[in-house]
């Protein structure tokens, strides 16, 4: 009986030791089950100017996807935001549509604090090596691009790289202070693969990558942090590739 008791005690301790691991595995499974997937259509945009991208995506019947997940109760405001994405032989095409209670475009140059303005963002891991890129664009078409495996120590794109991104904004390209009152705006971007400056990316044909899409406005009257794929963190954070969804490129 003493031996059986010792065996039972050992089994009990082994089971207890496994509980944190099982909980962690369950959390990982839940995280994966919440991840969204999106098929990215390939289109031809040869000689198409950036301002014509919305019309091209209409013609190609590329659907909009909502950016409408409010991840943090402290920031409940949820403007109407949607995006659509396609790709070509040499670039990613992005188109955002927004309706919100105010807009702001104080960051008047690239690599400035565009996240403080009315801002849409595209974060992605294009090469599967853990390095992710953050492309952030305010409502006047000024952008910021960073790259790295973590939030700290990120490398900013040079102006030469930033200039390769073609931008169109329905509000024009001039900076302005906050305008209060419901406003609808759009931006379109042509993002050539060479913008992923830490990699030698030449095509996304047939590839699957992870990514997330965001809307924020740190200094708008209604501060908010929306995402396409949900983020399970206590405080607002977009630099969290563990919560990216999946993009499947044709």
Description of each model-found segment:
Residues 1-6:
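Positively charged n-region of N-terminal signal peptides that target proteins for export
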Residues 9-17:
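Bacterial N-terminal signal peptides
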Residues 21-22:
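Sec/Tat signal peptide C-region and signal peptidase I cleavage site
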Residues 25-250:
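Structural preference for beta-rich elements and adjacent junctions enriched in aromatics
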């Amino acid at each position: 009986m003493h031996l059986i008791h010792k065996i039972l005690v050992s089994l009990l301790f082994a089971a207890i030791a496994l509980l944190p691991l099982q909980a962690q595995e369950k959390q990982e499974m839940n995280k994966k089950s919440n991840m969204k997937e999106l098929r990215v259509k390939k289109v031809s945009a040869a000689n198409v100017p950036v301002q014509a991208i919305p019309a091209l995506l209409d013609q190609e019947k590329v659907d909009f996807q909502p950016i409408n997940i409010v991840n943090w109760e402290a920031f409940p405001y949820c403007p109407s935001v949607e995006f659509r994405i396609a790709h070509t032989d040499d670039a990613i095409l992005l188109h955002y549509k927004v309706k919100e209670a105010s807009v702001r475009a104080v960051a008047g140059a690239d690599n400035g604090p565009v996240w403080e303005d009315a801002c849409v963002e595209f974060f992605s891991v294009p090469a599967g090596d853990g390095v992710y890129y953050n492309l952030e664009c305010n409502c006047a078409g000024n952008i910021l691009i960073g790259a790295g495996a973590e939030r700290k120590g990120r490398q900013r794109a040079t102006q030469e790289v930033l200039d390769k991104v073609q931008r169109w904004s329905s509000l024009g390209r001039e900076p302005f202070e906050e305008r209060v009152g419901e406003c609808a705006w759009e931006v379109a971007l042509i993002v050539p693969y060479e913008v992923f400056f830490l990699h030698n990316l030449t095509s996304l044909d047939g590839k699957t990558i992870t990514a997330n899409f965001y809307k924020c406005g740190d200094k708008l009257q209604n501060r908010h942090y929306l995402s396409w794929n949900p983020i399970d963190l206590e405080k607002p954070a977009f630099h969290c590739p563990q919560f990216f969804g999946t993009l499947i490129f044709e």
